[in-house]
């Protein structure tokens, strides 16, 4: 296509779109730019794959350091594996796109977003989301779009669209809203304990801006003469569908109302119906029967139609009767149990959070400032993280066997969400300088493990003695929409997540929301339904919080005896080199003497860590004496370092030497210095004079016995 260049004036900042400039062999390609941030988004599709029953969509977001005028480090001087932030942005693009493709589409779709240029104000993520919609439309892939996304910030009492990095950092809200013409399709947010109503207003505010961007895409389509591609769904074998329904529907209904069945028992019962009532019946049909011919040609046909029938019956039961497969009401939370301190104190904090069959074991570890995760290797201005949450989902948690791999996108995404939920309640760094890591091990899963990780993290932090501002709990909300009938489900379990239309995770304190994430399987939700889901989550969160506080209602007053003890002090930044010493000699000596770990910040903040408080105090005293200002008349216990004919040099503090003239060694006349002192001797001295060059003149004369006894040894 010919080059197309269009600028959209959007909330005080232009968004520039260029099509036909780059990647002519991609199905669709758009360069979307705001400020100095520019992202190339491409969409490509291929022919359908045989034998799959899912949408083969792949989304990748990539960052290049040339975008910020930098060269990668390392021997190869190339970008390595994508950082965690890039994986999270890939998910951010994927989640609003996926529900807008036909669920029966089986052609491979690949979306690649590459940041080509980046400034320090405009984040590339929401640009990439909006750009993906334009690229998909241009690629003529069937799509229920257009779709767009914006970020909403809160500065004071005012919402703003697409805030800068600094505005997000200084505000109380970081919310991304994506939507289609049918409504909201994705929400993700971190908030500083904002009330539900504020969050609802922010989403509504953001969706209005999304509608403007959708309108701009329609204008572009009109100018270019493009239309959104449509495709007809594959035909359904109605005879086979009726055959399955006639033989299985009643049996499925009976299983769905056996509320005492566990997850494994229910799954087994449903599988047994498919195997006996359907597959055995098909096997008994004549070889030339159309149904048998169909199933032999398409072995997955029975499974797909049976799954569709189960989904339909479960959803009808919820909509018509208001009863779920485990017998709960729509707004009822599964049974909860909480335990803390399950492991020996070598693990600094531990908690087991159980909700139904979902079980999360969270373990907290306290570290020193040097353990903070350095984030300075990518394009973003953030320096380091002092709170880390890692989420693990082993195969045994769902009774499966799989090879163990490094964390995938799902694990990284769930871990980041739970981390975001806790961040607003962490104590300030100057009050609690520890770096904290929580690992949530999902040991059993039946839905809502990410919110279980939030609850487990809170309990583990309190068990570890971390003085969090307030405890945080979380709940996952679901949705069933049949025509105009909408039912919102509280605390969804696995089957409801799998067969439902929404997974809306809400976390927060009794004051307000700290994090939320909404994913859809339908093409959009009205604001009324979004608001109702957020409001319905509140009593669930508070109920869960009550259960947690019944086990531990405040952080433990003491840390684990195996947690490091931290002391902080300030020194003049000009003295940092003195404390470190040539080649790190001085600081290494202090750490070896005291068994401590020392971190020094550029502003002169010194953090000392040791398992025993006395060792940390010893290191602090050494650094204090090393950096303190000496005054005339003060008495010290020093060590003789060398002798010259006219006197002896004494180190009174680490790195600080003075000289005792031979006449100041004793009351009597001294013929040779060696008569009074030798190298290595400890001597009590007084600062007699500090000359204009800062040199110390010391004396052993005129020191009262009480002063000598009170001197604290510095080496």
From Swiss-Prot:
GO biological process assignments: mRNA catabolic process; RNA processing
Domain KH: 564-623
Family: Belongs to the polyribonucleotide nucleotidyltransferase family.
A single MF term (Gene Ontology): RNA binding
Record-listed Mg(2+) binding positions: 497, 503
Organism: Crocosphaera subtropica (strain ATCC 51142 / BH68) (Cyanothece sp. (strain ATCC 51142))
Protein's recorded name: Polyribonucleotide nucleotidyltransferase
The entry's keywords: Cytoplasm, Magnesium, Metal-binding, Nucleotidyltransferase, RNA-binding, Transferase
Reactions performed catalytically: RNA(n+1) + phosphate = RNA(n) + a ribonucleoside 5'-diphosphate
Function recorded in the entry: Involved in mRNA degradation. Catalyzes the phosphorolysis of single-stranded polyribonucleotides processively in the 3'- to 5'-direction.
GO (cellular component) term, any one: cytosol
Cofactor requirements of the protein: Mg(2+)
Superkingdom of this protein's organism: Bacteria
Domain S1 motif, chain residue ranges per copy: 633-701
Record-linked CDD domains: KH-I_PNPase, RNase_PH_PNPase_2, S1_PNPase
NCBIfam families assigned: polynuc_phos, PRK11824.1
EC number: 2.7.7.8
């Amino acid at each position: 296509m010919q080059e197309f260049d269009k600028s959209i004036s959007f909330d005080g900042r232009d968004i520039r779109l260029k099509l036909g400039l780059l990647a002519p062999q991609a199905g669709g390609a758009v360069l979307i730019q705001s400020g100095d941030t520019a992202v190339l988004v491409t969409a490509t599709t291929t022919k359908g794959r045989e034998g799959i029953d899912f949408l083969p969509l792949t989304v990748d977001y990539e960052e290049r350091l040339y975008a910020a005028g930098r060269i990668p480090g390392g021997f190869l001087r190339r970008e390595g594996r994508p950082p965690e932030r890039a994986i999270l942005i890939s998910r951010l693009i994927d989640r609003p796109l996926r529900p807008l493709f036909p669920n029966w589409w089986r052609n491979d779709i690949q979306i690649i977003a590459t940041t080509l240029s980046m400034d320090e104000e405009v984040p590339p993520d929401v640009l990439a989301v909006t750009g993906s919609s334009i690229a998909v439309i241009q690629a003529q892939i069937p799509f229920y779009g257009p779709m767009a996304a914006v970020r909403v910030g809160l500065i004071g009492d005012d919402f703003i669209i697409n805030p800068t990095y600094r505005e997000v950092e200084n505000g109380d809200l970081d919310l991304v809203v994506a939507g289609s013409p049918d409504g909201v399709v994705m929400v993700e947010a971190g908030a500083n304990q904002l009330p539900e109503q504020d969050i609802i207003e922010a989403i509504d505010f953001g969706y209005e801006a999304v509608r403007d961007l959708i309108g701009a895409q329609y204008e572009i389509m009109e100018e270019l003469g493009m239309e959104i591609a449509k495709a007809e769904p594959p035909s359904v074998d109605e005879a086979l569908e009726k055959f399955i329904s006639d033989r299985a529907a009643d049996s499925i209904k009976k299983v769905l109302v056996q509320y005492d069945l566990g997850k494994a028992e229910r799954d087994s019962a449903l599988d047994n119906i498919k195997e006996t009532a359907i597959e055995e019946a098909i096997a008994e049909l004549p070889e030339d029967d159309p149904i048998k011919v169909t199933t032999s040609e398409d072995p997955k046909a029975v499974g797909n139609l049976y799954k569709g029938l189960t989904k339909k019956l479960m959803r009808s039961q919820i909509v018509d009767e208001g009863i779920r497969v485990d017998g709960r009401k729509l707004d009822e939370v599964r049974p909860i149990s909480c335990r803390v301190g399950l492991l020996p104190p070598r693990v600094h904090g531990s908690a087991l959070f159980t909700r139904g069959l979902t079980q999360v074991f969270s373990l907290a570890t306290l570290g020193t400032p040097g353990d903070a995760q350095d984030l300075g290797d990518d394009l973003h201005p953030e320096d380091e993280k002092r709170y880390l949450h890692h989420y693990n989902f082993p195969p045994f948690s769902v009774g499966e066997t799989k090879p163990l791999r490094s964390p995938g996108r799902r694990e990284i995404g769930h871990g980041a969400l739970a981390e975001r939920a806790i961040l607003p309640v962490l104590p300030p760094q100057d009050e609690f300088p520890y770096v904290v890591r929580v690992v949530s091990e999902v040991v059993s899963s039946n839905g809502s493990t990410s919110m279980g990780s939030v609850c487990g993290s809170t309990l583990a932090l309190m068990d570890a003695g971390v003085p969090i501002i307030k405890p945080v709990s979380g709940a996952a909300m679901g949705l069933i929409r049949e025509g105009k009938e909408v039912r919102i489900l509280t605390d969804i379990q696995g089957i409801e997540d799998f067969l439902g239309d929404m997974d809306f995770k809400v976390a927060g304190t009794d004051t307000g929301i700290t994090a939320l994430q909404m994913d859809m399987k339908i093409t959009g939700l009205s604001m009324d339904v979004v608001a109702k889901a957020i409001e319905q989550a509140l009593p669930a969160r508070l109920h869960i919080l009550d259960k947690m506080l019944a086990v531990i209602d405040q952080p433990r007053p003491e840390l684990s005896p195996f947690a490091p003890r931290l002391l902080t002090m300030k020194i003049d930044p000009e003295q940092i080199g003195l404390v470190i010493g040539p080649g790190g000699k001085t600081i290494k000596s202090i750490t070896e003497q005291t068994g401590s770990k020392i971190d020094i910040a550029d502003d002169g903040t010194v953090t000392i860590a040791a398992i025993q408080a006395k060792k940390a105090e010893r290191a602090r005293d050494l650094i204090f004496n090393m950096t303190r200002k000496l005054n005339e008349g003060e008495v010290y216990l020093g060590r003789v370092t060398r002798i010259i004919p006219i006197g002896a040099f004494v180190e009174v503090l680490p790195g600080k030497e003075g000289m005792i003239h031979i006449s100041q060694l004793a009351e009597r006349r001294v013929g040779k210095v060696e008569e009074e002192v030798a190298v290595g001797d400890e001597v009590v001295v007084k600062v007699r004079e500090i000359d204009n060059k800062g040199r110390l003149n010391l004396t052993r004369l005129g020191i009262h016995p009480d002063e000598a006894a009170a001197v604290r040894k510095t080496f």
